[in-house]
């Protein structure tokens, strides 16, 4: 299913582990790749974790890097020029951009300047003034009014993501398309045998396992999560916290755990391509992010019947099953501890049918992608 006759569109997604990239790869796996396939635009010239997977599906990795330029100002100029040449030299006709207005509208401008006929802007982030710097806010506000002149299709994973990324008239007039973050639902179905095996392998058979998956950055609010767990551990000494992911704040969070003397109870698990098994081992999934467009991890956790505790800053579109509860970040940490403890006797079973009805089956999302882009390509 990797025909040379397949028509390709260019998508922006880093090829390391992450929610957006995982979603795009899952969609790609469900395409009829004899008809439509993805190529990937990356901004850094290095081998990444998921690169071999997409190359194996017939994709090309297209690099527009300026990492070889030391001067910061010149690096920016060089990156823009190389992006322009990338679009021009590869005769790109369709670009599917996963991003936000403050960081990615430059790519849109360059794409249009180079002759790209159709740009879809697909936003996954609901943003937050808590962690965004002033320059980012200023750039976002400056770019938004320009978007309708350069962007051909507006897609969002949630209403909050649309409000954060798109001009007001696009949101008010509902010009954007809601695209659920589809997953391979069956892969996450609850399985008691897998749960028991993974818990044995991890050495947490008799533990109350709290889980989290997310990049170590300010947005994900790991500091708050660790503080909540520290309070929980004082009341439940059988509790352990499994943190999946990597990122720039991982080391500082490890130092925080050491200061709290929780090294034996908080485990930094790194990245894995078997998260579906890790959800099985957990008892509660906690996500206190400052904001989320629509967290894929929250959908995956629900599919496995795992109770999910979210900050009320996270979009409500993820609230599909009876597994989900929300709490304000302004609440005392004792309220979070109490809510986590309330899940000890939660009845665990798969919720995949509920999620399928809500549109979170990656097969349905892939079908929409394919029909949409084949129709666009037919018109070009």
Residue spans of the language-model regions?
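A short, active-site helix/loop in glycosyltransferases that binds the activated sugar's phosphate group
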Residues: 149-189
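A short helix/loop element that forms part of the nucleotide-sugar donor recognition site in Leloir-type
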Residues: 189-203
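Short hydrophobic beta-strand element within catalytic cores of glycosyltransferases
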Residues: 307-311, 316
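A conserved mid-protein helix/loop that constitutes part of the nucleotide-sugar donor-binding site
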Residues: 18-26, 208, 212-231, 248-254
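N-terminal strand-loop element at the rim of the active site
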Residues: 10-18, 22, 26-78, 176, ...
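Active-site donor-binding acidic/aromatic loop of nucleotide-activated sugar
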Residues: 241, 249-252, 262-272, 278
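Aromatic "clamp/platform" in nucleotide-sugar-dependent glycosyltransferases that forms part
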Residues: 100, 271, 290
């Amino acid at each position: 299913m990797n025909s040379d006759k397949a028509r390709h569109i260019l998508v922006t997604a880093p090829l390391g582990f992450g929610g957006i990239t995982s979603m795009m790869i899952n969609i790609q796996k469900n395409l009829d790749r004899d008809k439509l396939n993805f190529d990937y635009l990356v901004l850094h010239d290095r081998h990444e974790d998921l690169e071999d997977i997409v190359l194996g599906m017939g994709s090309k990795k297209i690099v527009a890097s300026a990492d070889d330029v030391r001067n910061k100002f010149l690096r920016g100029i060089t990156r823009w020029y190389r992006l322009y040449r990338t679009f021009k030299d590869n005769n790109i006709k369709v670009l599917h951009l996963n991003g936000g207005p403050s960081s990615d509208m430059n790519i849109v401008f360059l794409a249009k300047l180079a002759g790209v006929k159709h740009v879809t802007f697909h936003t996954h982030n609901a943003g937050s003034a808590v962690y965004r710097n002033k320059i980012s806010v200023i750039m976002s506000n400056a770019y938004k009014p320009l978007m309708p002149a350069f962007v051909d299709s507006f897609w969002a994973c949630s209403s909050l993501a649309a409000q954060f990324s798109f001009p007001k008239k696009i949101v008010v007039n509902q010009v954007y398309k809601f695209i659920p973050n589809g997953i391979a639902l069956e892969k996450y179905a609850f399985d008691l045998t897998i749960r028991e095996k993974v818990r044995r392998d991890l050495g947490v058979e008799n533990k109350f396992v709290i889980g989290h998956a997310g990049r170590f950055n300010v947005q994900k609010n790991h500091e708050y999560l660790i503080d909540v767990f520290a309070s929980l551990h004082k009341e439940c000494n059988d509790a352990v916290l499994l943190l999946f992911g990597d990122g720039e704040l991982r080391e500082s969070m490890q130092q925080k755990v050491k200061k709290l003397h929780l090294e034996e109870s908080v485990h930094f698990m790194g990245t894995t391509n078997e998260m579906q098994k890790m959800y099985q081992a957990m008892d509660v999934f906690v996500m206190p992010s400052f904001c989320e467009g629509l967290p894929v991890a929250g959908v995956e956790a629900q599919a496995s019947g795992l109770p999910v505790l979210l900050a009320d800053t996270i979009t409500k579109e993820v609230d599909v099953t009876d597994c989900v509860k929300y709490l304000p970040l302004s609440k005392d940490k004792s309220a979070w501890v109490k809510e986590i403890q309330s899940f000890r006797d939660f009845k665990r079973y798969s919720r995949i049918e509920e999620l399928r009805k809500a549109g979170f089956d990656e097969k349905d999302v892939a079908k929409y992608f394919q029909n949409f882009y084949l129709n666009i390509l037919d018109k070009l």
